Amino acid sequence: MKGFYMYYLGIILASVIGYFLGSISWSIIIVKKVGNIDIRTVGSGNPGATNTVRTLGKKWGLVVAFLDALKVVFTAIVAILLSMIPNDLFSQTSYFIPCIFALIGHCYPIYYKFKGGKAVSCFLGLLFVVNVLYLIIFLIIWFISVAISRKVSVASMFSALIILLIMWIPYLSGVSYFIWEWNGLEKFRVAWKNYILFSLLNSFHYWFSNTWASGILEGNIIILIGGLILAWRHSQNIKRIKNKTEPDTFPKKVKPVR
């Protein structure tokens, strides 16, 4: 039995904790607390940051987005703490894999009958954990896309698609060629020694003098899974976009006729 769990107990524990953290719906909690409204009964009915904007305004929508992203980051911190336990069962605890379970918990929360958000804010948290540079690129593309389309759904899906394409460029991870090995410690070592910390949290493996760190391939697979979940959660939006019935999240202000 120990052979099965060898090296992976930390991943399993962090993933379970991540799912329960991800299942906390900040939009439901905050909208109920601030406006005494069940967010699932107003607007799009989706318990997420965008519907919070529609219900309470941009300020509270930003708060919800930040807290939802933080669920993924906290999950990574749990994994980091577990990896520091001086035991083989925790020595290869991935900081990436548990984070996808936080995203799944956000979309399918056990506390709310498995009906949750659309993964965008948690996807931002996932990008921060895997590669900060991906997060910066996503946000730049997102803001430009929102300004053009006025639709958060379009901006989110388009930005995620761009990340899924460019993440295969090795230089964006601070290395000169793609790392196919599951253990990325040796290949990342030079980049981290030179303080090229695009993969900021992953570098904690190095600073803790560990013998293992997640490779680029693992991070990309996790981002790919997160991107596919994001697209799946936007399936109804995609249908409305095709039918040209998707409403603007931020409608253009019409100047009054004088």
Swiss-Prot record:
Keyword Heme applies: no
Topology versus the membrane: Multi-pass membrane protein
One GO location term (cellular component): plasma membrane
BP terms from Gene Ontology: phospholipid biosynthetic process
Spans traversing the lipid bilayer: 11-31, 62-82, 94-114, 124-144, 160-180, 212-232
Keywords (A to Z) from UniProt: Cell membrane, Lipid biosynthesis, Lipid metabolism, Membrane, Phospholipid biosynthesis, Phospholipid metabolism, Transferase, Transmembrane, Transmembrane helix
GO MF entries: acyl-phosphate glycerol-3-phosphate acyltransferase activity
Any one Pfam family match given in the protein's UniProt record, by short name: G3P_acyltransf
Origin superkingdom: Bacteria
Pathway: Lipid metabolism; phospholipid metabolism
Listed EC numbers: 2.3.1.275
InterPro entries xrefs: G3P_acylTferase_PlsY
Physiological role: Catalyzes the transfer of an acyl group from acyl-phosphate (acyl-PO(4)) to glycerol-3-phosphate (G3P) to form lysophosphatidic acid (LPA). This enzyme utilizes acyl-phosphate as fatty acyl donor, but not acyl-CoA or acyl-ACP.
Quaternary structure, from the entry: Probably interacts with PlsX.
Protein name: Glycerol-3-phosphate acyltransferase
Gene: plsY
